[in-house]
Structure formats: C-alpha cells, structure tokens
Amino acid sequence: ASGLMARKQMEQLIKNCDEFNISLYDINNPNQGIVHVIAPEKGMTLPGMIIVCGDSHTSTHGAFGALSFGIGTSEVEHVLATQTLKQQRFKNMKIEIIGDVPQFVTAKDIILFVIGRLGSSGGTGYVIEFCGNVIKKMSMEERMTVCNMAIEMGAKSGIIAPDEITYSYLREKIYSPYGLFWKKSIDYWKTLKSDKDAFFDKCFTIDVSNLAPQVTRGTNPDQVTSINEKIPNYNKFHSIVQKNSAKSACKYMGLKEGTYLTDIFIDKVFIGSCTNARIEDLRSASTILKNRKIANNVKAIVVPGSGSVKQQAEMEGLDKIFINAGFEWRLPGCSMCLGMNNDRLNVGERCASHSNRNFEGRQGRGGRT
C-alpha cells in the first residue's frame, strides 16, 4: 500500500512540475540526488536567499549566507501559492569556533562536540551564526556539514557569512550569476555579514585545539564522546533527566558505562546522507580505506549525495577503492540515513553512520546508530 501511495505521489509531482514549468531532477536525470547536495553544487543556493524546504536539514544552505530552514507540508503549499511565509522573529546566537584543528578532526567532529556542549535543545528558537578562525578556514562542503547539524541542537537554522571561499565555490556554477551580474552579486554578497557591534541573544566561544574525533554513543546527537574515551558513568550527570536519558540510551544501544568506544563492535557502515556524502567526504573516507579491507562480518555501503558526486568520484577512481575495501557502491539518494527502501538495520544491529541522526529506529526498527 505504501509503495502504491508513493508511486501516485511521484506521478502527481511530475505532473505538477510539468504543468507549472518547475525544473525536476527525477530519477532519470544523471545529476539527481539529495536536494541539499544538488542545490549548492549547481549554484541554485546563493548568499542572501531565503530558502525553505519540506525537510529539517534545509539549514545546510545557511553555509552560503542564506537564511534557510525546514517547513511543514501546509507551509510548503502556502509558499508555492503566495511566495510568502509568516514567521515570528527568531532569536540569534553566535558560536565562535577557535583554535588549531588537530589532525583527523573533521567539521562533523566539531559540530558534534558543540552539540554535546550545548545540548540537543541548546539552540531552540535560535538562528545560529557560526564564525571564528576555524570556520573561516573551512571549505564550503565542511561549512555545509556544520550548518546541516545546527538543527540537532534545536536551532531553526545555522548560517555563515559568505567570503572569498564562498565566491570561489560558486564561480561558474550552472545557476550562478555570470558576467556583469556576477560582479554585482559579489558586491552585494560582501554586505551580508554581522556588524562588529551586532547584538546576539547568546554568545559562545569554543576552542577545539585539543579535540579528538567524536562518536555518538546514545540515541540523541548530544550523547557524544571522544573516540579515545569511555562511555561515561551515569553519576557524571548532574541532572536527573540527563542521568535517566543516559541509562535509557545505553539500554537501547546495548552498551555499558565504562566501555571504551574503540571496543564496540559494529555490523554495518553507512557513508552517505545530506551531512557527509559530498566529494570531499568520499575522498577523505577513501584515503583511509585505500589498500585496506573491512571485516568479513561487516556490511558497508557508500551512497553519493548526487549523480554529479558519483560521476566525479568514479573519474577519480574512488569507487574502486571502496569496492576493493569491501563496500557496495550505490546510486545517489538518502538510503540508510532514514532506513529508506531496504537499506535499513535489523533489530539489534549496530551501524557506524555518516548521517546526522541517531534516534531510536531511525535506520530501522531496533537498529543502533
């Protein structure tokens, strides 16, 4: 029944796009994939835009200095009908990331650490501006990872001021401005930054100089621990709510306090999602996997974020590195991030996942992310 409903929904979507002359990257389009990967790589996402989409991780586009956030179905209808959306004023928060980033620490590690510090509701009601020397040095794909995960601390969106790295990324993209319009656009984009004396409702400065790679151990993105540490003792938490949440998470995950994260066995590996399925992510993973093999009892898949990413990876020979290491090389899409199609965990299976959420059942009923 659900398959039939999905087919009808897709057929209606195709019909509506055709009727109203809306570009559709359907499954037959060689560049199809995840919207939060396609829009930036094609230059559809530009600084200063207001972008809404029926998906919470629309905040990804904030990496370009665009105000972007997820909306519900009825709001999507309203936007399509009126090109407007009534919103209450958001509170604003500044998170300054400073320090020298250690080797092997990624943008994903940094944002997970921030979420662990502030909590899964620490950003509720806020649009968060990320800044600081660490953010300035990040590539656009790294910045997208940071803004993508802002939602996991309850924020409405994340945003980063555009700069030369932004302009360089957007130059000569299919939908980017060109010629005289390009120069005028950059002149405008340079104004899209907070004033030096701008007021923020909350400000935080976080030094990542001593940060180690981060791994979530529970059923919420703020239940995060450094890879070289143990699962914390319940008594470490001062709040009864946090203590009970940690106990509940360990029970669901089949883990015990005091266990080193490096001693935990896994059943599956998923490289993909709108958080970490871009070409830089695949390059990083392939560098580690080159001339190595995964264990025989582990099933691993790579799902590029778009057809363009897949094509680029294949041109660079990355697909062969993954395949030789024992991974399946898949077509673009969302896949195991949310247990789509048959890409899901079985009850009790544990997955090391590149995705953004580790909720109970997110990757399959009883699955442990």
Swiss-Prot record:
UniProt enzyme class: lyase
Domain of life: Bacteria
Residues that hold [4Fe-4S] cluster according to the record: C274, C334, C337
Cofactor: [4Fe-4S] cluster
InterPro entries given in the database record: 3-IsopropMal_deHydase_lsu, Acnase/IPM_dHydase_lsu_aba_1/3, Acoase/IPM_deHydtase_lsu_aba, Aconitase_4Fe-4S_BS, Aconitase_4Fe-4S_dom, IPM_dehydratase_rel_enz, IPMI_cat
Documented EC number(s): 4.2.1.33
Binding partners and assembly: Heterodimer of LeuC and LeuD.
Reported function: Catalyzes the isomerization between 2-isopropylmalate and 3-isopropylmalate, via the formation of 2-isopropylmaleate.
Protein name: 3-isopropylmalate dehydratase large subunit
Species assigned in the record: Buchnera aphidicola subsp. Uroleucon rurale
